[in-house]
A protein has these predicted regions:
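Gly/Gly-Pro-rich "capping" loops immediately C-terminal to redox-active cysteine motifs
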Residues: 69-106, 115-150
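Stable alpha-helical elements in mature extracytoplasmic
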Residues: 41-48, 53-56, 101-104, 142, ...
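Electrostatic cytochrome c docking/interface patches
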Residues: 30-51, 81-96
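C-terminal capping alpha-helices of c-type cytochrome domains
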Residues: 156-216
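Post-cleavage N-terminal segment of exported redox proteins
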Residues: 2-43, 55-58, 63-73, 199-217
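Phospho-regulatory, low-complexity terminal regions
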Residues: 20, 141-151, 158, 214
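The canonical Cys-X-X-Cys-His
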Residues: 53-64, 100-113
Length: 217
């Protein structure tokens, strides 16, 4: 009888959790406008670029050297002539981008839905800490480069602009790096604007045809 009661309790709790999950309000809304001009799309992308190139995003969107960066005011001082430095402790995430070959990122960066961490303590979020795929290299890249990368399915995970918007909302819903970018805690500077504004800009840029600035801009 006790086993039956326990089984029923687990079933009820599981069903309630599933129902709550299915009806919970998304952490950000995706509401594409009916129309958007090229000028509006370019303005939206400029704000997207400000987010993508910000230290909270770009520091882990690095190239095939697989070394995360430390940039932004909380990581000063920097080497002469630079506004950034390599991650301390000789960290290299290797080809796996999670450090499995040497020292996993999760050794210091916990996986926990609690985004709060002390200043200069390893930050953490709700999914395993890792570098973004190398195709998503943003650190030190121009607005034109990042724009063309984001609109290229071969370099953005096979997504169209709506897929990119859903990626932002889904990642944030799992309390991943997207949400952490605006809630980094400690003395870390958050990404500009807000998650909702970023999603709004993504869909405006998409409806406008994903226009990109020229390299000179």
């Amino acid at each position: 009888m006790k086993k039956l009661i326990l089984s029923i309790s687990v079933l009820v709790v599981g069903t309630m959790a599933y129902a709550a999950d299915k009806t919970a309000k998304p952490i950000a809304d995706i509401n594409p406008p009916t129309v958007a001009t090229e000028a509006e799309g370019l303005a939206a992308f400029q704000r997207i670029y400000e987010v993508a190139s910000h230290p909270r995003c770009a520091n882990c969107h690095v190239g095939d050297d697989n070394i995360p960066r430390w940039s932004g005011p909380s990581y000063a001082p920097f080497p002469p002539g630079q506004d950034w430095k390599y991650h301390g402790m000789n960290i290299n995430a290797d080809v796996s981008r999670i450090g499995v070959e040497t020292l996993p990122c999760s050794t210091c960066h916990q996986t926990t839905p609690d985004l709060k961490s002390e200043s200069h303590a390893p930050p953490h979020f709700g999914i395993d800490w890792q570098l973004a795929p190398v195709e998503f290299e943003w650190f030190g890249k121009s607005a034109s480069f990042i724009c063309n990368q984001l609109k290229d399915p071969d370099r953005n995970g096979g997504r169209d602009w709506m897929g990119l918007a859903h990626h932002l909302v889904d990642d944030a819903g799992h309390r991943g790096p997207v949400l952490w970018g605006w809630k980094p805690s400690g003395n870390r500077e958050p990404a500009p604007y807000s998650l909702q504004q970023h999603v709004d800009d993504m869909v405006v840029w998409g409806v406008a045809g994903q226009p990109c600035p020229s390299e000179e801009e």
